[in-house]
């Protein structure tokens, strides 16, 4: 009966799992399915559902054995142990565990059990330690990828892997020399990537290397010495060669690479080059389509480009090139990407239309010394960046005719005149820090593609254009440091993707609270900069309710920085000026999880809303230079990520909440020039602050202020108790000796009067009507009336 039950349970499990299997996985035997489930259960896999996991499973239709396993990226977290059920899948031919988090895991030697493996990819999976020697048993491997881990030790033992065609060991910490017989023992090797390690020594390439199948070689960012360049020049089948930052003491003569007739991509950045090898008569592979010469100490524009008519991509950024860009450069027939950033170029040879007929699509000549009018951009422009130059005059209207243009960055120049009224087709418009005038064009049509609009630090006037509501993809809007006069744009909260809104240093006015006194409730806003305007009024208690972006989350598109628009050949990242920890600074890159609010320099009043405590991911809060009153909200203690807090120059009262000491990331706090009192809380968050952070509060005391909190002198508790007891004894003695004799005399008199009943007595109390009079009650009655009589006299005296 027990055996029958177990069989039914196993059958149920198989049927249940099979319901999630793909067509390729349906052929799997029960024991293989069980091993797969056990393997999954060895790790935390909350971000991985069963169907995602099993989609990467493939079994042989004949044997039912698992032959392919490809885990989804970011699916597993945990340690890959030697006894893992993974190593029971002996028929595996393809195994890809890349982009998972196998924390604290070394590479188990049990990988050698999988002797049928042909493809093994463990890239970006947090593996550490040395590569086990047993990996040399995987003699059928054709593809081995161990890149982007923290593997150490000498070069892995791969000599026996004679079928290898792909070997990627980049971005690790391997040290020592490359085996001198590596290439002869791996005759099929076509892809070898060793960059970003600690490899040393020279490179030995045998004379027979002309028959080598190696077509892609990356050796950059290591610590080689001795012979490197000459041996590589023997690998005549190379089409992709990367030799960045080789740490060679002498300049490299590019003419050495002339034998590489098939070379297409050559990256030799961060090396010193022999100037003569950059001349137009130098022999160089004419097949080149991409040449990367970043940071090579080049001082003159390389004439070698004249002969390289197949070039599509040129990068000579971060050099020392002076003078003008020659006119012939724009006539290279296939040139589509030109990066001239960070040189000392002063302009362009030829007319202002020298670029017009160029084939260039991505053009970046930012951070140079170019002056004069801006040239007419190429007809096929996609990306155009000229920030940080000294161009003058108007922005050319020819930009409006560039239908392919996506990114336009002309910031940090000296442009004047109006903003062209044709920018809604662009994803990125950055015109920051020029001298542009007029208003922001109200020409953003329905379906506008704009994601970033930065026109800060100009001389713009008018109001914010309501047509911005058509920019449903707008993420970043900055109009800071202009002369815009308008009320707060509550209507912008209809934009579902707005992350950054910067209105600082304009002439905005009116209330910040919505007309219905409800929460502001921007759905995705993370940075709100409203400082140095004329906003007035108070903020309702629920002002910060429903700010969804204050909660931690991972970007679905994988972006790290705001405005991080990436292409294979360019990156654009939004920049902004932020006041942080008391300092005003420009942030060249702003992380997507960064969250800050700055309302400083306005005329806001009333209490700071307690709902501020709901913004748990807020990093910086600046409410200084306003007229806020009341206490510092205790709910600020819930803002656990807070690093910078500035509440200075308001009218806040009460004590500084001790709960703020629980904010472990709080590095800067200023409450200067308020009406606070009491002792400054002691703790690491407060003790490290400057005295100026608390000055201007008459009632505050304690470190870091000079004066300590001194209480009035008090007596010792024992003496106080003894004196209190003595006073109580004296008081009771006075009561006893003063009250009881009088009471006794009163009782005697009452007894006498009650016995004889004189006429005056009867007039006061009235006839007894045959009742016996109680002497005590009689005395109390007389005493009460006597008090009434005395009180009457007192009232009369007051009237007089």
From Swiss-Prot:
Residues 20-733 are extracellular. The chain crosses the membrane at residues 734-754. Glycans are attached at residues 49, 61, 83, 96, 101, 113, 145, 160, 207, 247, 342, 357, 388, 401, 470, 622, 638. It comes from the Eukaryota. GO terms for cellular component: plasma membrane. Pfam families: LRR_1 (PF00560), LRR_8 (PF13855). LRR repeats lie at residues 89-113, 115-138, 139-161, 162-185, 187-212, 214-235, 236-259, 260-281, 285-307, 308-332, 334-357, 358-381, 382-401, 402-423, 424-446, 448-471, 472-494, 495-519, 522-546, 591-615, 616-639, 640-663, 665-688. It is found in: Cell membrane. It is a single-pass type I membrane protein. Residues 755-800 are cytoplasmic. Keywords: Cell membrane, Glycoprotein, Leucine-rich repeat, Membrane, Receptor, Repeat, Signal, Transmembrane, Transmembrane helix. The keyword Repeat applies. Its main location: membrane. The keyword Transmembrane helix applies. Residues 1-19 form the signal peptide. Belongs to the RLP family. This is Receptor like protein 26.
């Amino acid at each position: 009966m027990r055996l029958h039950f177990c069989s039914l349970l196993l059958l149920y499990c198989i049927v249940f799992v099979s319901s999630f299997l793909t067509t390729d996985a349906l052929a799997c035997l029960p024991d293989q399915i069980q091993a797969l489930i056990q393997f999954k259960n060895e790790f935390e896999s909350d971000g991985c559902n069963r169907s995602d996991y099993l989609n990467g499973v493939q079994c042989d239709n004949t044997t039912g054995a698992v032959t392919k396993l490809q885990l989804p990226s970011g699916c597993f977290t945990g340690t890959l142990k030697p006894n893992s059920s993974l190593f029971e899948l002996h028929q595996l031919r393809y195994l890809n565990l890349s982009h998972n988090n196998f924390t604290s895991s070394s590479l188990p030697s049990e990988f050698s059990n999988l002797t049928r493996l042909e493809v093994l990819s463990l890239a970006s999976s947090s593996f550490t330690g040395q590569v086990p020697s047993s990996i040399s048993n995987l003699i059928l491997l054709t593809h081995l990828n161990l890149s982007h881990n923290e593997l150490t030790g000498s070069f892995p033992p791969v000599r026996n892997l004679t079928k290898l065609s792909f070997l990627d060991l980049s971005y690790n910490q391997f040290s020592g020399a490359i085996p001198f017989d590596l290439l002869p023992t791996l005759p099929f090797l076509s892809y070898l990537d060793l960059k970003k390690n600690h490899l040393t020594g020279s490179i030995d390439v045998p004379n027979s290397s002309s028959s080598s199948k190696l077509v892609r070689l990356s050796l950059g960012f290591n610590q080689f010495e001795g012979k490197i360049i000459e041996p590589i020049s023997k690998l005549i089948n190379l089409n992709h060669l990367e030799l960045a930052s080789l740490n060679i003491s002498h300049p490299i003569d590019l003419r050495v690479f002339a034998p590489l007739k098939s070379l297409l991509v050559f990256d030799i950045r961060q090396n010193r080059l022999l100037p003569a090898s950059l001349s137009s008569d130098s022999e160089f592979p004419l097949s080149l389509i991409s040449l990367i010469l970043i940071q090579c100490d080049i001082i003159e524009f390389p004439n070698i480009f004249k002969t390289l008519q197949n070039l599509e991509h040129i990068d000579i950024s971060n050099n020392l090139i002076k003078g003008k860009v020659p006119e012939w450069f724009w006539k290279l027939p296939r040139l589509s990407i030109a990066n001239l950033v960070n040189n000392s170029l002063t302009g362009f040879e030829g007319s202002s239309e020298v670029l017009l007929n160029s084939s260039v699509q991505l053009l970046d000549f930012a951070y140079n010394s170019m002056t004069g009018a801006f040239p007419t951009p190429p007809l096929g422009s996609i990306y155009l960046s000229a920030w940080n130059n000294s161009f003058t005059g108007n922005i050319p209207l020819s930009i409006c005719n560039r239908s392919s243009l996506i990114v336009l960055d002309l910031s940090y120049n000296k442009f004047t005149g109006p903003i062209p009224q044709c920018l809604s087709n662009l994803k990125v418009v950055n015109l920051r820090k020029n001298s542009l005038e007029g208003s922001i064009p109200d020409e953003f049509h329905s379906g506008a593609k704009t994601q970033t609009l930065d026109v800060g630090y100009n001389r713009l006037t008018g109001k914010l254009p309501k047509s911005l509501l058509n920019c449903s993809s707008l993420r970043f809007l900055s109009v800071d440091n202009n002369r815009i006069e308008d009320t707060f744009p509550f209507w912008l909260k209809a934009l579902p993707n707005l992350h950054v809104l910067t209105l600082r240093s304009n002439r905005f006015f009116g209330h910040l609270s919505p007309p219905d006194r409800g929460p502001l409730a921007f759905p995705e806003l993370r940075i709100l900069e409203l400082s140095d305007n004329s906003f007035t009024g108070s903020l309702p208690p629920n002002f910060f309710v429903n700010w969804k972006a204050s909660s931690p989350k991972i970007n679905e598109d994988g972006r790290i920085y705001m405005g991080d628009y990436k292409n294979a050949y360019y990156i654009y990242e939004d920049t902004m000026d932020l006041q942080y920890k008391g300092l005003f600074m420009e942030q060249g890159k702003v992380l997507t999880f960064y969250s800050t609010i700055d309302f400083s320099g306005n005329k806001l009043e009333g209490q700071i809303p307690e709902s501020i405590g709901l913004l748990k991911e807020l990093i910086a809060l600046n409410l200084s230079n306003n007229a806020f009153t009341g206490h510092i909200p205790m709910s600020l203690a819930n803002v656990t990520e807070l690093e910078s807090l500035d509440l200075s120059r308001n009218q806040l009262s009460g004590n500084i909440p001790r709960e703020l000491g629980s904010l472990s990331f709080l590095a800067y706090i200023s409450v200067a020039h308020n009406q606070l009192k009491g002792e400054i809380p002691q703790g690491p968050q407060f003790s490290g602050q400057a005295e100026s952070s608390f000055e201007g509060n008459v009632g505050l005391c304690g470190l870091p202020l000079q004066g300590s909190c001194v209480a009035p002198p008090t007596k010792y508790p024992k003496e106080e108790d003894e004196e209190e007891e003595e006073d109580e004894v004296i008081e009771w003695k006075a009561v006893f000796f003063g009250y009881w004799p009088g009471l006794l005399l009163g009782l005697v008199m009452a007894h006498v009067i009650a016995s004889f009943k004189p006429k005056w007595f009867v007039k006061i109390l009235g006839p007894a009507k045959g009742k016996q009079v109680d002497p005590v009650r009689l005395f109390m009655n007389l005493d009460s009336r006597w008090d009434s009589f005395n009180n009457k006299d007192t009232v009369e005296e007051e009237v007089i």
